[in-house]
């Protein structure tokens, strides 16, 4: 945070930017190059054996309200150390975020923390601000799912999105299954004990750590051989030689022997095609086929990949190889005229790209004031704009009273001839 921030911004303090992910939350201030904190999106309750995830879509509203209230209190008063009444808020959200969740979140911010204004910004659109481009095919590989959404001339093409339940959660489930089936543990009492006899289930934090420290994505040729050996359709396919085994310490006394075959096979579930021939790579191609034909070439040459799962070693190289391999198949070859695919390299780690875009947008204070939902408007109506709602109020009603609109906004809303 700048030492003299009040002098250069007309007295208005920089906005708070929150990227509320299902696994981790990124939080910081607009105009900065990185978040102040990246913390698990969980809270701990007395008497509960496990931490409670804050981002849940299948619980009642009042329970969700209490979780969000406690979690955001931690963000403001343990990590950011600022008064929430003094600063606008930019919330990075998914376009598929359920309405009841975003309404509960804004109710917490306006009614409990009394923030001046809130802007709900799509994560896919914010990612493009870090690159200075206005058209791209954006793939977000997160914890629960992988979601692809084309952005053309700054407008999300909402009828061309695609999603699959392939992300960090699926990797953790597959990793736990293989570890419990194949791996052994050395303890102080005995050697080479089966893992289920020592611990019935593996905590999520340990699975995350094993995945990050030991797992990687193989190249296309090796990956196809691993998949062929796994399914063994013809009965004579041999698996490529595995990487070295890794000894992973568990709570200081136990040593878990992670097999090399697990290290490179776990991530293959992202690229294995299911019964409907769907994978992370086909998500991009299928979305591209739904786009207007005159936009496909530009979108194919501007791929942007964000999300923590995409940070696995070798992921981007494999994704590009998979796309180039699949585009030669009859399903796509006759429809997609382009064969050129390029992936951008954003100026931040993949898990922080959307947050950085929100920090850039939040630093434009005139634009931020004209696009945010003000506290006065929310207190009068109790509503927030929603792209999937047909009865949104006029845009002029949502902005701060007395706030001068920038020239582009004046032209957009002007009724003068």
From Swiss-Prot:
Pfam families: Actin (PF00022). Keywords: Cytoplasm, Cytoskeleton. Belongs to the actin family. Subunit of dynactin, a multiprotein complex part of a tripartite complex with dynein and a adapter, such as BICDL1, BICD2 or HOOK3. The dynactin complex is built around ACTR1A/ACTB filament and consists of an actin-related filament composed of a shoulder domain, a pointed end and a barbed end. Its length is defined by its flexible shoulder domain. The soulder is composed of 2 DCTN1 subunits, 4 DCTN2 and 2 DCTN3. The 4 DCNT2 (via N-terminus) bind the ACTR1A filament and act as molecular rulers to determine the length. The pointed end is important for binding dynein-dynactin cargo adapters. It comes from the Eukaryota. It is found in: Cytoplasm, Cytoskeleton. Gene3D superfamilies: 3.30.420.40, Actin, Chain A, domain 4. Part of the dynactin complex that activates the molecular motor dynein for ultra-processive transport along microtubules. It comes from Bos taurus (Bovine). This is Actin-related protein 10. SUPFAM superfamilies: Actin-like ATPase domain. One of its GO terms (biological process) is retrograde axonal transport of mitochondrion. InterPro entries: Actin (IPR004000), ATPase_NBD (IPR043129).
């Amino acid at each position: 945070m700048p030492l003299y921030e009040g002098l250069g911004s007309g007295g208005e303090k920089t906005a708070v930017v929150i990227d509320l992910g299902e696994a981790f939350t990124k939080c910081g201030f607009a105009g900065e190059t990185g978040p102040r904190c990246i913390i698990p999106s969980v809270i701990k309750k007395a008497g509960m054996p496990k931490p409670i995830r804050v981002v849940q879509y299948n619980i009642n509203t009042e329970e969700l309200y209490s979780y969000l209230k406690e979690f955001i209190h931690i963000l403001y008063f343990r990590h950011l150390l600022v008064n929430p009444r003094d600063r606008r808020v930019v919330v990075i959200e998914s376009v598929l975020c359920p309405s009841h969740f975003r309404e509960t979140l804004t109710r917490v911010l306006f009614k409990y923390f009394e923030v001046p204004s809130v802007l709900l910004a799509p994560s896919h659109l914010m990612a493009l601000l870090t690159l200075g481009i206005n058209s791209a095919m954006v793939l977000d590989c997160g914890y629960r799912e992988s979601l692809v959404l084309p952005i053309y001339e700054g407008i999300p093409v909402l009828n061309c999105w695609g999603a699959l339940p392939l992300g960090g959660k699926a990797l953790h489930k597959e990793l736990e299954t293989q570890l419990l089936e194949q791996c052994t543990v050395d303890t102080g009492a005995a050697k080479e004990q089966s893992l289920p006899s020592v611990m019935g289930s593996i905590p999520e934090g340990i699975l995350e750590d094993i995945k990050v420290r030991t797992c990687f994505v193989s190249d296309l040729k090796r990956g196809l051989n691993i998949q062929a050996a796994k399914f063994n359709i013809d009965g004579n396919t041999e698996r490529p030689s595995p990487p070295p085994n890794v000894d992973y310490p568990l709570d200081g006394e136990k040593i878990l022997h992670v097999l090399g075959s697990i290290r490179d096979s776990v991530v293959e579930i992202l690229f294995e095609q299911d019964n409907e021939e769907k994978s992370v790579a086909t998500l991009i191609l299928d979305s591209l086929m739904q786009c207007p034909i005159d936009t496909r070439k530009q979108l194919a040459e501007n791929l942007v990949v964000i999300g923590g799962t995409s940070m696995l070693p070798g992921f981007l190289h494999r994704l590009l190889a998979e796309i180039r391999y699949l585009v030669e198949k009859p399903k796509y070859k006759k429809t997609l005229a382009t064969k050129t695919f390029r992936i951008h390299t954003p100026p931040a780690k993949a898990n922080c790209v959307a947050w950085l875009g929100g920090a850039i947008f939040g630093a434009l204070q005139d634009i931020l004031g004209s696009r945010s939902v003000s506290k006065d408007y929310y207190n009068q109506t109790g509503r927030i704009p929603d792209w999937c709602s047909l009865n949104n109020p006029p845009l002029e009603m949502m902005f701060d009273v007395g706030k001068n609109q920038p020239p582009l906004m004046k032209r957009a809303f002007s009724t003068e001839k």
